[in-house]
Design a protein with these regions (language model features):
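Positively charged n-region of N-terminal signal peptides that target proteins for export
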Residues: 1-7
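Ordered, soluble secondary-structure elements with a strong preference for glycine-centered loop motifs
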Residues: 52-56, 245, 287
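Periplasmic polypeptide-binding modules associated with outer-membrane biogenesis and secretion
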Residues: 22-35, 44, 48-107
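Alpha-helical scaffolds that organize eukaryotic protein assemblies
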Residues: 263-264
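Extended repeat-based scaffolds of very large eukaryotic assembly and lipid-transport proteins
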Residues: 100-198, 206-209, 213-243, 247-258, ...
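Bacterial N-terminal signal peptides
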Residues: 7-17
Length: 339
């Protein structure tokens, strides 16, 4: 099953958190990480509801939720947008004893980007914001990197091809030893345009454990595009390990989970048994929870992954989804896996 063109989701593109949402009304609230702690208890501590506005202090709300018994950490993230144009608020918790995704300490080196890359990337972000507001976010990943349909964005992305070829070593050094998280995020995105994708896979997989959310998200976007090219050219030398993506399905950060699930849909397209076994061992509860999210484009990747991991045929998965039987499938697969 194709993931609705497998377009990477632009959630306040290349940024994270509530600040980018600018206080819109909440259309949908969804949760993840709930195992023993109930949704009702988290909702009470959240103290906002559908139809209200996003909380003015993300940190204050997270702190309230973290006071609940059994909650180690909480995280709020707003995504744009539901079918009515309202914000989607994701509330994640990590319970005591639950799976935990570890990040590396911040790098302490002195690597920095070549000066000419930074202003072009800044213009790229601005162009993406304009394109997103007008709904022009379609992109082509078949070259192993993003080329958006919007001509202004695409022209800037095409400059990244030259930068990645010219400055591969510099980008690699910034990812591993750059003290500035913004520069590491830029490097993780631009290096994805390298002409020989197979030579930078290890650098991007290293970035998947960066302590900064945006660095990880950009690395996932780059690797997800590599996976599209790998599927198109199965004899290529591109080899992407699914392990860190699978571990990220248990992350406290919504962007980690969402982008990891999108990438894994491509990486499990061949249904390689060793990868499906990893999903069954490490991520079935997380997948079932994510597959039940109310916003269907966000739920679909996990729904596909849960179905594949549990041996459901692709046609049956697609048929049940189109008939609106998603929740029944999730319940059935979850029950079967628990036996």
């Amino acid at each position: 099953m194709r993931l609705m063109h497998l377009r990477l989701i632009f959630t306040c593109f290349l940024t994270a958190g509530l600040a980018c949402a600018q206080g819109p009304r909440i259309g949908t609230i969804d949760f993840y990480g709930l195992r023993k702690v109930t949704e009702a208890k988290v909702r009470k501590a959240l103290a906002v509801s559908e139809g209200g506005v996003l909380p003015s202090s993300k940190a204050d709300v997270e702190e309230r939720i973290e006071k609940l018994p059994g909650v180690v950490e909480a995280h709020l993230e707003a995504a744009c947008c539901d079918d009515a144009g309202k914000a989607i608020l994701y509330v994640g918790i990590e319970e005591k004893g639950a799976a935990h995704y570890n990040y590396r300490p911040p790098p302490t080196g002195d690597a920095a980007l070549p000066a000419e890359i930074v202003p072009v990337y800044a213009r790229f972000l601005g162009a993406v914001a304009v394109a997103s507001r007008s709904g022009h976010v379609a992109e082509d990943l078949t070259h192993g990197h993003s080329l958006m349909s919007d001509p202004d964005v695409r022209a800037l992305q095409e400059q990244f091809v030259g930068f990645a070829a010219k400055y591969t070593d510099d980008l690699r050094k910034v990812i591993r030893n750059g003290p500035n998280e913004e520069q590491r995020a830029i490097a993780a995105y631009v290096i994805g345009y390298a002409p020989r994708k197979e030579t930078v896979v290890s650098d991007l997989q290293y970035a998947l454990q960066d302590p900064d959310d945006t660095v990880r998200n950009n690395a996932m976007r780059s690797l997800a595009a590599f996976a599209v090219l790998q599927r198109k050219q199965p004899d290529s030398e591109i080899k992407i390990s699914p392990t860190w993506f699978i571990e990220m399905l248990n992350s406290i950060i919504w962007g980690d989970r969402n982008n990891a699930a999108v990438a894994l849909v491509t990486l499990t397209d061949s249904r390689e048994e060793t990868v499906l076994e990893q999903l069954r061992e490490r991520a079935l509860p997380a997948l079932a929870e994510m597959a039940g999210w109310k916003h269907l484009p966000h739920a679909l990747p996990a729904y596909i992954l849960q179905g594949r991991a549990c041996g459901m045929k692709e046609e049956a998965l697609q048929d049940a989804w189109s008939k609106g039987e998603r929740m029944a499938v999730i319940k059935k697969l979850t029950a079967a896996a628990s036996k």
